[in-house]
Amino acid sequence: KNLIFLGSSCIYPRISRMPIKEKYLLTGELEKTNEPYAIAKIAGIKMCESYNFQYKTNFKCLMPCNIYGPNDNYDLETSHFFPALIKKIHNAKKKKKKFIEIWGNGKAKRELTYVDDLADACEFFLSKKTKEVLINIGSGYELKIIDYCKFIMKKMKCSLAIKKNSKMPNGTPRKLLDCKIAKSYGWRHRYTLEKGFNFTYRDFLRRNIK
């Protein structure tokens, strides 16, 4: 039996050596802001490991970094940072505002992977026999939150001041994944940040997100 369970880069220890290897799971304290989510995901991973041991199944746990792309969630109360930035900057430009606000100091670094790359990884590894249960899936490319702001502004052809809300958390400082295991089986990501953003923003405009 084959199964893909999706973990996440945010269930690794809050402070970890970079890039993050699969073996670092459960070697340090979790990020408090998403601890319940992390515990639930880790429980699923342990179930997969136990099934493989007891029933000789072929269950794998892919560990993606931040995923973005068409049909993303742009609700500012519940969305991840990248779609939130897209919406904030788009709306600020449209309403001729002079600034946007971000959480924390903007120095936390994040790695992004386009949604089609994750879908490709799921299909690639579903029936493939691997000795590893955990397999990181990422692009190998990270930027500071504040630099993602500048990238989006450049793509939208606008310039806005960035107001940092120090009352809000920064989150985990870095979450860059080591994807050597995935690459050893022949998987590679295909979408650059620029290409992925173009598809994502086109979808955002098509859906007329308010």
Model-identified regions with their sequence ranges:
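Glycine-rich, phosphate-binding/catalytic loops in enzymes
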Residues: P19-K23, T78-H80, A119, M153
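Short aromatic-enriched loop/helix-cap "lid" or pocket-rim segments at secondary-structure transitions
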Residues: I15-M18, D72-E77, Y148-C149, R174-K175
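Conserved active-site helix of classical SDR/Rossmann-fold NAD(P)-dependent CH-OH oxidoreductases
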Residues: I42-E49, F82-K87, A119-D120, I146
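Alpha-helical segments that scaffold the active site and NAD(P)H-binding pocket
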Residues: E49-Q54, I86-H90, S127
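C-terminal substrate-binding subdomain of Rossmann-fold SDR/epimerase-dehydratase oxidoreductases
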Residues: N91-K210
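Glycine-rich "substrate-gating" loop/helix at the edge of Rossmann-like oxidoreductase active sites
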Residues: N34-Y37, C65-H80, G104-D116, S139-Y141
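N-terminal Rossmann-like NAD(P)+-binding domain of SDR-like oxidoreductases, especially those catalyzing
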Residues: K1-N73, F199-R202, K210
